Amino acid sequence: MPFRRSSLNHRHRDGHVLVWNQRNLHESLEQQPQRCFATRYFVTFMLFLGMANAYVMRTNMSVAIVAMVNHTAIKSGEAEEYDDECGDRDIPIDDSQDGEFAWSSALQGYILSSFFYGYVITQIPFGILAKKYGSLRFLGYGMLINSVFAFLVPVAARGGGVWGLCAVRFIQGLGEGPIVPCTHAMLAKWIPPNERSRMGAAVYAGAQFGTIISMPLSGLLAEYGFDGGWPSIFYVFGIVGTVWSIAFLIFVHEDPSSHPTIDEREKKYINDSLWGTDVVKSPPIPFKAIIKSLPFYAILFAHMGHNYGYETLMTELPTYMKQVLRFSLKSNGLLSSLPYLAMWLFSMFISVVADWMISSKRFSHTATRKLINSIGQYGPGVALIAASYTGCDRALTLAILTIGVGLNGGIYSGFKINHLDLTPRFAGFLMSITNCSANLAGLLAPIAAGHLISDPSKPMMGQWQIVFFIAAFVYIICGTFYNIFGSGERQYWDNPEDDEQKPALQTTVTTSPARLSNGSTAPAAISSS
């Protein structure tokens, strides 16, 4: 279905086409208000902290469980022998670091994955509820539930055993479920379209920031903290999350119109630039067309493959570093965060490269997405295979894994934003589907790893090699599927035929027209013919 240019004089917005990132576009006839720290920037900062807190709660168990498990008591009193294929190490393992619980690797896998069961089942429901009732309270109270139940983790582990702990982590996952869909909805209400790209990137960078903070600090608390070390991880982060939740509910408001102290010029600027999101009805979702769309399945499988590989690294890397590479708890937490620091930095760099590739007109949207995504999925796949052959060289293994996870940052300029290329109108719905499915795949990772390491008293390198090989295989296969069937072009089902009689909102274009994903050019607002 070809695109055509439409008149710049229309202001009616029945078409309801959302444009996330148009360069040199002014949504309002007035100039953007000049303030050092506008209210929308404060909202963005609070959402960044919320995302960071969410990932702290999500990842701290992977470090804590290393300190919780009494490795010398596993297998009915048989002493655990660390992987002896490498011989003596220059940093000996301190057996006094053994914890309170004799949990097998399989049980540890269930504990690590229980959080994700709760997280997965609430993705789509909260996406629907947030659209109908607003996002603020779901996000704030969800994080509050997550934080309060963090205080109960030590109590559940000591009093309720494995399944009591799994229940608490499951409830924490339920509380974290609203984070992504509600954050997305808040950004849609507060951030003008021409700012969403950088503001959205700033908010979601909180995920990597939270992981970077969680890993080393959890390691330090496990070794030097109060109440036996590992419980302090959940007490400290529980306090931080509770404080953030209360502050968020008090100081942040649902939208600019409901904010009592926002500058009137900023409120007008935001409301004028948000193209009628609250006054028009979205067209029906074209379920049949989406189900038949190969580019949609390309994103779906790429997302699922990424989550499986990423969760394998996130949940199992601290255990591998202690049991095989023999890092101490303090070193474990610090060094485990290095790959995510690399991912954070590389994702920032590669996003600039991706923007240049598209703006230079040397690469199409499709070519850019596939090339950058290949780096993001083939890179960690190859690194996992290489790391499985590095043997006892701890420095080389850590370096390879750091590079591999760092390259994984390419996915943020690959399939992660490809929803917007295919369908600006239904991108949120597509994200809820792929994110839910991807997290289902991700929760299988720690369970699979726990069963593959069949002898928990001797986690041999060969067993870990299988874990790495499977994750690498999933990365590469799903990345290849994306390269074959993926697309950066806007899909025909994003523009129903009745849009022909419904002119879209137009805005003042001050410079060159935007370039569409199919290679044609048009003003920022477009309609189909």
Curated annotation (Swiss-Prot):
List the InterPro entries hit by this protein, alphabetically.
Answer: MFS, MFS_dom, MFS_Na/Anion_cotransporter, MFS_trans_sf, Pi_cotranspt
Sorted UniProt keywords:
Ion transport, Membrane, Sodium, Sodium transport, Symport, Transmembrane, Transmembrane helix, Transport
Q: Which GO terms describe its molecular function?
A: phosphate transmembrane transporter activity; symporter activity; transmembrane transporter activity
Question: What is this entry's stated membrane topology?
Answer: Multi-pass membrane protein
Where can this protein be found?
Answer: Membrane
The record's Gene Ontology cellular component field reads:
membrane
Q: Where is this region: Disordered?
A: 495-529
Give an example GO biological process: sodium ion transport
Q: What is its main location?
A: membrane
Q: Where is the composition biased (Polar residues)?
A: 504-529
Q: Name one Pfam family in it.
A: MFS_1
List residues traversing the bilayer.
Answer: 37-57, 110-130, 148-168, 202-222, 232-252, 338-358, 429-449, 466-486
**SUPFAM superfamilies under this entry?**
MFS general substrate transporter
Query: Where on the tree of life does the source sit, at the highest rank?
Result: Eukaryota
Family under the similarity heading: Belongs to the major facilitator superfamily. Sodium/anion cotransporter family.
Q: Which PANTHER family match?
A: MAJOR FACILITATOR SUPERFAMILY (MFS) PROFILE DOMAIN-CONTAINING PROTEIN-RELATED, SOLUTE CARRIER FAMILY 17
What does this chain do?
May be an inorganic phosphate cotransporter.
In Swiss-Prot or TrEMBL terms, this protein is called Putative inorganic phosphate cotransporter
Biological source species: Drosophila melanogaster (Fruit fly)
Its organism's taxonomic lineage begins at: Eukaryota, Metazoa, Ecdysozoa, Arthropoda, Hexapoda
Gene (UniProt): Picot
